[in-house]
Amino acid sequence: MPFKRLIKSIDIGRAAESQAEKFARAQGFTIVERNFRCKGGEIDLIARHGEHLVFIEVRHRSSDKFGSAAESITQKKQQRIILAANIYLQKKGLTNMPCRFDVIVGNLKSNTGFQWIPDAFSCW
């Protein structure tokens, strides 16, 4: 039944985001917001790290059958994240704050943990 698969997928996604948040905190990041949504897109985690505001995309795959988790972040997805980040910065009055876009990828079914990809893409 497709609806049950969708619910399971959402639950797995939330679990991956929770684990990624713990991973980010363990790396010294301070989480300031989770699941920021706006008309243009969504940002999974927003964190402070040193002087930077870091917009973090969390990707999870249960298998690499259709490509890796990192490969699933298309140019179009990057553009939506960048748009959402710009909206966030404007709403919070932080347009002069240095920022970057990181990615955390993982597989909840394996013991490989998470991989951090700093500066995974750029808005320039």
UniProtKB/Swiss-Prot annotation:
<dbReference type="Pfam" id="PF02021">
    <property type="entry name" value="UPF0102"/>
</dbReference>
<dbReference type="InterPro" id="IPR011335">
    <property type="entry name" value="Restrct_endonuc-II-like"/>
</dbReference>
<dbReference type="GO" id="GO:0003676">
    <property type="term" value="F:nucleic acid binding"/>
</dbReference>
<dbReference type="InterPro" id="IPR003509">
    <property type="entry name" value="UPF0102_YraN-like"/>
</dbReference>
<protein>
    <recommendedName>
        <fullName>UPF0102 protein HCH_05895</fullName>
    </recommendedName>
</protein>
<comment type="similarity">
    <text>Belongs to the UPF0102 family.</text>
</comment>
<dbReference type="InterPro" id="IPR011856">
    <property type="entry name" value="tRNA_endonuc-like_dom_sf"/>
</dbReference>
